[in-house]
């Protein structure tokens, strides 16, 4: 049987590194279909830190796409697992027959599914991408994204799968020891990416709570974002006193980020699509409820796991937030499907499906 090839077709260092390390540590030892990767980006020590994997790096999207298409044409039994699919050339290859549906398996990351960019080239490309998506052999996604995708592509097979968020299961019960009282701290956004709509989110928080809460805005990723960070800071200072606004411009190491999250009482995310599942997982693990946009279908995954969900359209106050905290504290977090190690079973099944080992 031909070994499955995994494709990280865009240079998204943080996510790509997470996927590679997860496969190296959790999957490669038990499945030959978890070892071969084609990746856009620089090695930067990844080969050394992932010795169980065979990783081929490419300088850009186009060179990787050309190599994938050549492999697909040379052997029609060769199957590919696309982790997030932001590479236009690969969509066009699927649409034109360069890659066959039986060769194309796609794990939806969120941003690669929704049509939120307003630029002309995106608006011209979206209809072509939609046509190509009808030809995907199987999609893997969160419950909410599967539901969203099925509205336009009901005939494409869909399977539940969660991004492998880096988590320590031993921390699942730590939140229960924490006393929550006094001024609330609210986390706004999951990164410095503009998709978080930071300014609109800060205004929404201020409208709900006024200048009575402390707001923390993590913006250390992506790099070279100083102008936008300053724009958000100035907008925040128009709404909140200096002591109540903390805009973080430096990238935090994982343990420091975890410590930051555990100081919060609420996460506030207004983006209208599924994103930031890693931050959501870490907040939920710490017993911190989240406010979501009702257009973000991840609320379906949360309610399926009996987790409280607050919405940006709700009338929020401290009593409601504290009640959500109490509800979250009563949930057995060891049973949550999108937590580590529970998502591992979904990955093992996804590999078997993509490799053709199970129907």
UniProtKB/Swiss-Prot annotation:
It is a peripheral membrane protein. It comes from the Bacteria. GO terms for cellular component: plasma membrane. Its EC number is 2.4.1.325. It catalyses: beta-D-ManNAcA-(1->4)-alpha-D-GlcNAc-di-trans,octa-cis-undecaprenyl diphosphate + dTDP-4-acetamido-4,6-dideoxy-alpha-D-galactose = alpha-D-FucNAc4-(1->4)-beta-D-ManNAcA-(1->4)-D-GlcNAc-undecaprenyl diphosphate + dTDP + H(+). One of its GO terms (biological process) is fucosylation. It is found in: Cell inner membrane. Pfam families: Glyco_transf_56. Pathway: Bacterial outer membrane biogenesis; enterobacterial common antigen biosynthesis. Belongs to the glycosyltransferase 56 family. HAMAP family: WecF_RffT (MF_01002). This is TDP-N-acetylfucosamine:lipid II N-acetylfucosaminyltransferase. The gene is wecF.
């Amino acid at each position: 049987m031909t070994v499955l090839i995994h494709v990280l077709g865009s240079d998204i260092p943080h996510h790509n590194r997470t996927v590679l390390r997860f496969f190296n540590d959790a999957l490669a030892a038990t499945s030959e279909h978890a070892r071969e990767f084609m990746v856009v980006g620089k090695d930067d020590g990844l080969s050394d830190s992932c010795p169980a994997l065979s990783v081929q790096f490419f300088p850009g999207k186009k060179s990787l796409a050309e190599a994938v298409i050549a492999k697909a044409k040379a052997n029609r039994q060769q199957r590919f697992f696309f982790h997030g699919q932001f590479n236009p050339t690969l969509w066009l290859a699927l649409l034109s027959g360069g890659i066959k549906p039986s060769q194309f398996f796609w794990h939806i990351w969120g941003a690669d599914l929704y049509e939120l960019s307003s630029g002309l080239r995106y608006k011209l490309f979206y209809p072509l991408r939609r046509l190509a998506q009808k030809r995907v052999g199987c999609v893997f996604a969160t419950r909410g994204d599967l539901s969203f995708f099925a509205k336009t592509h009901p005939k494409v097979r869909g399977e539940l799968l969660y991004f492998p968020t880096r988590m320590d299961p031993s921390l699942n019960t730590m939140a229960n020891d924490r006393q929550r009282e006094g001024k609330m701290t609210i986390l706004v956004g999951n990164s410095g990416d503009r998709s978080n709509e930071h300014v609109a989110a800060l205004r929404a928080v201020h409208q709900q709570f006024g200048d009575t809460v402390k707001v923390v805005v993590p913006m250390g990723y992506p790099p070279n974002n100083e102008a936008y960070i300053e724009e958000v800071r100035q907008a925040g200072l128009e709404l909140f006193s200096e002591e109540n606004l903390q805009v973080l411009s430096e990238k935090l190491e994982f343990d420091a980020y975890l410590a930051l999250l555990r100081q919060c009482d609420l996460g506030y995310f207004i983006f209208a699509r599924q994103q930031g599942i890693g931050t959501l997982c870490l907040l939920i693990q710490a017993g911190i409820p989240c406010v979501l946009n009702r257009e973000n279908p991840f609320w379906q995954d949360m309610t399926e796991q009996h987790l409280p969900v607050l919405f940006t359209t709700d009338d929020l106050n401290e009593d409601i937030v504290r009640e959500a905290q109490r509800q979250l504290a009563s949930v057995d977090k060891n049973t949550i499907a999108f937590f580590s190690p529970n998502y591992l079973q979904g990955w093992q099944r996804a590999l078997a499906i993509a490799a053709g080992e199970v129907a």
